[in-house]
Amino acid sequence: RRGTAYSLLLQRVFTRRNFQSNCTPKLMPQANSYRIGHSPDPDDAFMFHAMTTGAINTGERSYEHVLLDIETLNKHAMNGDYEVSAVSIHSFPEISDKYHLMNCGASMGEGYGPMIISNREISLEDAKNLVFAIPGVGTSAYLALRLAMGDVKFEVVPFDDIMPAVQRGDYDVGVIIHEGQLTWKDEGVNLILDLGIWWNEKTGLPLPLGGNVVRKDLGMITCREITKDV
């Protein structure tokens, strides 16, 4: 994972004026123009930036960003709204009739993953009785939480508000993803469990978190060309 300073630099470079952030899908793009739905996480922005700025040769294909949180992207993918999208691996079985999973750009947690945090020292056993703030039921973070802790009470909170909500005391525990995994030590919260480490120790395997998908109705040739661009 990249350091915090690097992430802040990317956030300055990829300003939000370059992104389409409306949660309502736009009208269908022109021929050979494709929308890429991805999260505001800097590594996603970095991954797709070259495709949207002409930094690499994409032939006749052009791309535009659609900047949304991962749970919203999962929901849009259920409807097949965007031609290309980042999605949670947990949600992929639900959309596999509409999308191909690309063989590039996946997020695999090897020695890291979503983190369970609290605003005070709490044991893992005591945390099971509390209400968790989670980034969405379609996220791989929620699946990992369920695998590690079984049935727990939860409420869905935008991923970038989970840590502030825990700090405010709105929730005693939360599951953080994206930049929160890098900054939690500086935010004064307590780490209860790193779900990526838990999964690695349990299985010896990386934890599948996110992937990129391309819509099947574009045709196999176009899907392969877009995947090559990515």
What spans do the regions from the language model cover?
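Pocket-lining segment of extracytoplasmic ligand-binding domains
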Residues: 159-230
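Short loop/helix-cap segments at secondary-structure boundaries that form the rim of catalytic
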Residues: 94-96, 145, 183-186
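Active-site regions of enzymes building and remodeling cell-envelope glycoconjugates
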Residues: 99-103, 152-154, 189-192
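Bilobed "Venus flytrap"/periplasmic-binding protein-like clamshell domains
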Residues: 31-53, 112-172, 179
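N-terminal hydrophobic or amphipathic helices and topogenic motifs
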Residues: 1, 13-20, 24-107, 118, ...
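Intrinsically disordered, low-complexity segments enriched in serine/threonine/proline/glycine
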Residues: 6-8, 21-22
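Hydrophobic/proline-rich hinge and linker segments of small-molecule sensing/allosteric domains
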Residues: 101-124, 199-217
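A structural signal for short, well-ordered beta-strand segments and their strand-loop junctions
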Residues: 77, 86, 156, 174-176
